[in-house]
A protein has these predicted regions:
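Short, charge-dense linear interaction motifs
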Residues: 2-6, 15-134, 138-236
């Protein structure tokens, strides 16, 4: 009988130990955010040359001639040709629509979009003015960026992780627990944002070019942000 009781006690201790071992340790799941502000050191400008003529050969020739003049004026400012590229080229017939539902061919339209990368931000206004003064009749976009974007994104990510760690430590202390280890890390997002109203830039460029005044350009500040979710294991 004593042997049976001892055996039963040992079995119960083993079961209790096994059951306790199967219960995962408690954890805290927190989110962290990191934000880094940076001054842009690169601008990407897209200008367009739109020409319309009755004859397809004439519209192609006129568009090519104007686009070449635009590109040459930009190169004259010191922009290397490797930083100038054709973003898009289209050639389409243009129709006139009548009240009776019919349409007639009214000519042809060619559009050549030129993309320019500018690493000297002091030249951004000059590039826009030169393009408009030499035949470009559209400014499609103006975006500011960073040449070494990864370094700023890495810093934002580091700050996001530290933010998550700080939150976990505060929560664990309030619970009377300690952080034991990191169980899981999830990087939610990491990006660079710079809101820019290119329509305003286009309007300013048109007005200032007509007035023979250099287009004023303010690059503002870029925001590099990152967010993470981190699960920390805490003491029992």
């Amino acid at each position: 009988m004593k042997f049976f009781s001892l055996t039963f006690l040992i079995v119960m201790m083993i079961c209790t130990t096994t059951f306790a071992a199967e219960i995962p340790p408690p954890s805290i799941l927190v989110s962290g955010e990191g934000i880094v502000e940076a001054q842009p050191d690169r601008a990407t400008i897209s200008v367009g040359v739109v020409t319309r003529e009755k004859n397809p050969a004439a519209v192609q020739s006129a568009n090519a001639r104007t686009a070449t003049s635009v590109i040459n004026s930009i190169v004259a400012l010191g922009i290397e040709r490797r930083n100038i590229s054709t973003g898009n080229y289209s050639f389409n017939p243009v129709y006139r629509h009548h009240d009776n539902g019919k349409r007639t061919l009214d000519g042809y339209e060619a559009t050549n979009s030129v993309t320019i990368i500018v690493d000297d931000l002091n030249l951004v206004g000059k590039v826009i003015d030169a393009a408009l003064n030499h035949g470009a009749n559209r400014v499609d976009s103006l975006n500011f960026g960073l040449r070494n974007k990864a370094a700023h994104q890495d810093e934002a990510l580091r700050l996001a992780v530290l933010d998550a760690k700080r939150k976990a430590e505060v929560a664990a202390f309030a619970l009377g627990k300690n952080i034991v280890s990191v169980r899981n890390v999830s990087i939610n997002s990491s990006h660079v944002s710079a809101p820019r109203n290119y329509k305003m830039a286009r309007s300013m460029a048109m007005e200032d070019a007509a007035a023979d005044v250099e287009t004023p350009i303010e690059s503002g500040t870029l925001t590099c942000s990152a967010s993470v979710h981190v699960e920390f294991e805490i003491s029992r």
